[in-house]
């Protein structure tokens, strides 16, 4: 591990004296070799389009990245983090420039503020930091990439907590401060409970407005600002204590707005998120949370009364039924996903600095919780980078390397506070005084699956808890070592006793944690040692940081690290999209799936079969050879085997005891969930010691896409009404005419020579490029004969019928088995006997253009299928048979797909939607499940976003609604 310059002698140092500096140990780098020289670099073109209209919304060609970086990561880092105007000499064109801009700034600040024992240690620090960023081992939060090393203010914090008092001056300052934070690329939250309620009087004698009314102004301000100027939307949180007299109005704010959205949508307005008309609705730019205390929750449990208190006097001015109020919270969350819930007593029980004030608020995603007017800078580790896998099922977690990287990152994060700029003087003073950090991780869901652990299992929770305990224990250990070198945080002296108490709570929780298997046991052992060091070094040196860890959504930075999963989320699905370097994309089965199967003891042949099944079906149900007890390992956030709501809550509870702050997490519920289900989640999370959470019931928001089932139902209702109206109004003037679909000038075709009963001929079958058979030409050997003439006429009639929509299977069923001469033997191995030329022609067309199920029902099989029937008793092809012909050319429209076309004399046009194409993994899941994920479209590129903690992240371009 990293040591101080005084080495072993530091134990004899007089208390209060400082060590000379940190000795930085190499983790990954080689002396005399720069990390950039150890990788292969490649030039890439980044062209990002808006899927809605095809327009190019970002383009930069010839950027330089390591060749192992994914296309998606290159696109996101280039478009989000490269600085300078595109096309100017100031624009960054290489990842080297970006990383150098950051690590050199950190090194210089570390030297200026006396962190390192020598220039050699400073150089090792720079190289190790560069290596870790280059190899996507960790990432700072987005503001670091946006701002550090640029001429603009060096804002490094992603998370801010503001404060507002019961005065107009303070309220207007709140609006201004939020705007400045959004401008710097970050998010902010605050508690409004100090503002007097609408049930209390002003000094002038009138009634107060109440906090809900002032939320309107802040919401409107946030809606006009893009975070970071151009790359992110504003993210904000508003909180109200459960004992505030206006709590019911607060709970119902978004429910009432959702009702407005429904009415406006039904009236024809564009109410999708990002739509032109959604901005007319209030309270859409913030997450709302109710701060509940143990007194309230116990009253809910016991069915008692609960008092709402005056903001001015603290007296109870109204009593309410606690269970009814709790029910209203659950009903509102069920209806529109707000409000979330925060557990005040749990939060403050783990507070390291209670002598300096209570924890009242949180950042927008609810993972940072500390004093008012403070900030936290985040960094997240890519957990999959620490999984050692020999490819044969033997795995281990690299405990020592993980701890060393944590020490490196904590050191860098603390250095950044020294040179950072802050949006307000109060936030700057408080952050420098308490130096809150938020180290966390991403890819937990991928790690659990890769190691054969179900997300909702004792083994999965044990592994997640062990890693979290080691991370936070190592972070506080490094914080104590930093305190020995550059001193503890300014507020430590006043809060030394409660800080030590919280460290003891973390250590005690580690001591009673359950060890499950060979993966988590050595991690727990290392964590135990780390916490022992924390208690010893902290008592001697104090701590450099009031907080050390959070679990953030890791939206943009998770994609920049090519993570499969964000924060502590499980995997979205087993099949995802991978962008290709040359353009385009392909569907792939998660690489964690074969890793998990090897860990579970499956052989390579079995793994190939299971992966092939997943590729085809999107899930593991009925996968060949997969044991039923292993199904749970592959459970995901969406799909037929999705993780239950309480499975998410149990994972949060397994991690929370070793996190300084909280966890950004939304518990997803199915559309069929009840209000009682929401109540259960909120109540059990309190019992389990979770600090905060939010729920999201699929399709609860009108401003987001409905499920396919709902859309079809509504469309059917509208269509039925419309058709009835049309029939009544234009019945006498409607003419029913078929519509001909002509083939293009160039069309694919198959020419087949044949002999039937000695008569020779040729058949050319041409098809639409994407929609099956469109015409047939028949030529018999003797030109001018009656037979040849009849075949010409017959082929024209059939071709015209196909183009007017007559299904091919209708022709096949009518003309096969028709008897006339010539008949007899053929030279076609698939059709050995034909009762006529027409019989042969349509049997051949069926084999070439109809799917197996359709022609099998007509009794038409190939020679290979007949042989299979003799051997196995079944005509059906096995899973590994390549169905080239059927995949290439499907038949003309089948009978069940054929619909009457009414063409009124008045011009009536029906839009025919193009086949849906998926552009992201979220959209791919929708296509596989036949439902739509309830998530907004990205405001930058138009693709479907996906959940990341309590925020949304766009897999296509990296835009996020959160703050990481």
Swiss-Prot record:
Substrate binds at residues 142, 158-159, 187, 363-367, 553-557. Disulfide bonds join 159-376. Residues 12-21 have a biased composition (Basic residues). 5'-deoxyadenosylcobalamine (coenzyme B12). Gene3D superfamilies: 3.20.70.20. Its cofactor is adenosylcob(III)alamin. It catalyses: a 2'-deoxyribonucleoside 5'-diphosphate + [thioredoxin]-disulfide + H2O = a ribonucleoside 5'-diphosphate + [thioredoxin]-dithiol. The keyword Oxidoreductase applies. The active site is at residues 363, 365, 367. GO terms for molecular function: cobalamin binding; cobalt ion binding; nucleotide binding; ribonucleoside-diphosphate reductase activity, thioredoxin disulfide as acceptor. One of its GO terms (biological process) is DNA biosynthetic process. SUPFAM superfamilies: PFL-like glycyl radical enzymes (SSF51998). The keyword Oxidoreductase applies. Its EC number is 1.17.4.1. Residues 1-21 are annotated as: Disordered. Keywords: Cobalamin, Cobalt, Disulfide bond, DNA synthesis, Nucleotide-binding, Oxidoreductase. PANTHER family: RIBONUCLEOSIDE-DIPHOSPHATE REDUCTASE, VITAMIN B12-DEPENDENT RIBONUCLEOTIDE REDUCTASE. Belongs to the ribonucleoside diphosphate reductase class-2 family. Catalyzes the reduction of ribonucleotides to deoxyribonucleotides. May function to provide a pool of deoxyribonucleotide precursors for DNA repair during oxygen limitation and/or for immediate growth after restoration of oxygen. This is Vitamin B12-dependent ribonucleotide reductase.
């Amino acid at each position: 591990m990293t040591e101080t310059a005084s080495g072993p002698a530091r134990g004899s140092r007089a208390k209060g004296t400082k060590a000379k500096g940190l000795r930085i140990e190499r983790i990954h780098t080689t002396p005399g070799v720069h990390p950039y020289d150890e990788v292969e670099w490649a030039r890439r073109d980044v062209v990002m389009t808006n899927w809605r209209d095809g327009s190019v919304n970002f383009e930069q060609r010839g950027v330089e990245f390591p060749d192992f970086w994914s296309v998606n990561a290159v696109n996101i880092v280039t478009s989000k983090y490269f600085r300078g105007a595109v096309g100017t000499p100031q624009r960054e064109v290489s990842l080297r420039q970006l990383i150098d801009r950051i690590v050199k700034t950190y090194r210089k600040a570390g030297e200026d503020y006396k962190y390192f024992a020598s220039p050699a240690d400073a150089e090792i620090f720079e190289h190790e930091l560069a290596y870790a960023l280059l190899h996507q081992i960790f990432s700072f939060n987005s503001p670091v990439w946006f701002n550090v090393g640029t001429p603009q203010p060096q804002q490094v914090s992603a998370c801010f907590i503001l404060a507002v008092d019961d005065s107009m001056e303070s309220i207007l300052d709140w609006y201004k401060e939020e705007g400045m934070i959004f401008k710097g690329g970050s998010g902010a939250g605050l508690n409004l409970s100090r503002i007097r309620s609408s049930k209390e009087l002003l000094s002038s004698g009138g009634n107060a407005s109440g906090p809900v009314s002032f939320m309107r102004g802040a919401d409107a301000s946030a809606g006009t600002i893009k975070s970071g100027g151009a790359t992110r939307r504003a993210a904000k949180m508003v909180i109200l204590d459960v004992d505030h007299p206006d709590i019911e109005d607060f709970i119902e704010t978004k429910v009432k707005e959702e009702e407005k959205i429904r009415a406006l949508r039904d009236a024809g307005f564009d109410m999708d998120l990002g739509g032109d008309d959604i901005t007319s609705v209030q309270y859409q730019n913030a997450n709302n949370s109710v701060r509940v205390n143990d007194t309230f929750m116990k009253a809910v449990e016991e069915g008692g009364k609960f008092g709402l208190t005056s903001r001015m006097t603290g007296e109870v001015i109204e009593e309410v039924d606690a269970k009814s109020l709790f029910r209203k919270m659950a009903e509102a969350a069920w209806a529109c996903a707000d409000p979330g819930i925060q557990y005040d007593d749990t939060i403050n029980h783990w507070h390291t600095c209670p002598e300096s004030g209570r924890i009242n608020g949180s950042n927008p995603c609810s993972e940072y919780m500390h004093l008012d007017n403070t900030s936290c800078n985040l960094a997240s580790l890519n957990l999959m980078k620490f999984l050692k896998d020999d490819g044969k099922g033997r795995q281990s977690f690299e405990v020592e390397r993980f701890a060393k990287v944590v020490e490196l990152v904590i050191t860098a994060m603390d250095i950044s506070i020294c040179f950072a700029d802050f949006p307000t003087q109060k936030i700057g003073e408080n952050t420098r005084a308490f130096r809150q950090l938020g180290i966390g991780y991403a890819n937990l869901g991928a790690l659990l699956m890769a190691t054969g652990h179900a997300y909702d299992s004792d083994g999965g929770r044990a592994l997640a808890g062990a890693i979290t305990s080691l991370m936070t224990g190592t972070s506080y250990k490094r914080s104590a070592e930093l305190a020995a070198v550059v001193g503890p945080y300014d507020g430590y002296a006043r809060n030394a006793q409660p800080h030590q108490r919280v460290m003891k709570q973390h250590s005690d929780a580690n001591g009673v944690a359950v060890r499950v298997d060979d993966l988590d046991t050595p991690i727990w052992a290392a964590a135990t040692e780390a916490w022992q060091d924390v208690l010893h070094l902290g008592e001697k040196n104090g701590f450099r940081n009031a907080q050390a860890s959070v679990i953030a959504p890791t939206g943009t930075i998770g994609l920049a690290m090519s993570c499969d999963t964000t924060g502590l989320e499980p995997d979205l699905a087993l099949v995802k999209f991978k962008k290709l370097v040359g353009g385009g994309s392909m569907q792939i089965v998660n690489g964690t799936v074969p890793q998990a199967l090897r860990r579970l003891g499956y052989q390579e042949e079995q793994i190939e079969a299971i992966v092939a099944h997943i590729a085809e079906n999107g899930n593991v149900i009925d996968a060949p050879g997969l044991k039923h007890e292993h199904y749970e390992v592959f459970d995901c956030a969406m799909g037929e085997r999705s993780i239950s709501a309480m499975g998410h809550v149990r994972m949060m509870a397994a991690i929370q005891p070793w996190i300084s702050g909280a966890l950004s997490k939304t518990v997803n519920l199915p559309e069929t969930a009840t209000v009682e289900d929401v109540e259960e989640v909120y109540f059990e999370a309190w019992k389990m010691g979770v600090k905060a959470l939010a729920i999201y019931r699929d399709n609860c928001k009108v401003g987001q896409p409905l499920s396919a089932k709902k859309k079809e139902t509504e469309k059917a209702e509208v269509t039925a009404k419309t058709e009835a109206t049309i029939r009544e109004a234009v019945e006498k003037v409607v003419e029913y005419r078929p519509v001909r679909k002509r083939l293009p000038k160039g069309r694919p075709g198959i020419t087949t020579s044949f002999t039937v009963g000695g008569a020779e001929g040729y058949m050319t079958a041409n098809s639409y490029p994407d929609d099956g058979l469109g015409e047939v030409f028949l030529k018999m050997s003797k030109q001018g004969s009656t037979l040849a003439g009849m075949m010409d006429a017959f082929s024209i009639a059939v071709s015209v019928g196909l183009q007017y929509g007559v299904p091919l299977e209708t022709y096949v069923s009518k003309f096969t088995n028709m008897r006339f001469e010539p008949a007899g033997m053929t030279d076609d191995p698939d059709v050995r006997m034909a009762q006529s030329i027409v019989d042969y022609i349509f049997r051949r067309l069926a084999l070439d253009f109809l799917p197996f199920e359709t022609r099998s029902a007509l009794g038409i099989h190939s020679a290979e299928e007949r042989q299979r029937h003799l051997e196995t008793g079944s005509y059906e092809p096995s899973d590994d048979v390549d169905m080239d012909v059927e995949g290439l050319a499907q038949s003309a429209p089948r009978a069940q797909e054929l619909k009457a076309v009414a063409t009124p004399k008045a011009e009536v046009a029906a839009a025919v939607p193009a086949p849906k194409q998926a552009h992201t993994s979220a959209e791919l899941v929708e296509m596989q499940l036949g439902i739509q994920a309830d998530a907004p479209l990205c405001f930058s590129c138009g693709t479907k976003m996906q959940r990341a903690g309590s925020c949304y992240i766009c897999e296509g371009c990296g835009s996020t609604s959160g703050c990481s």
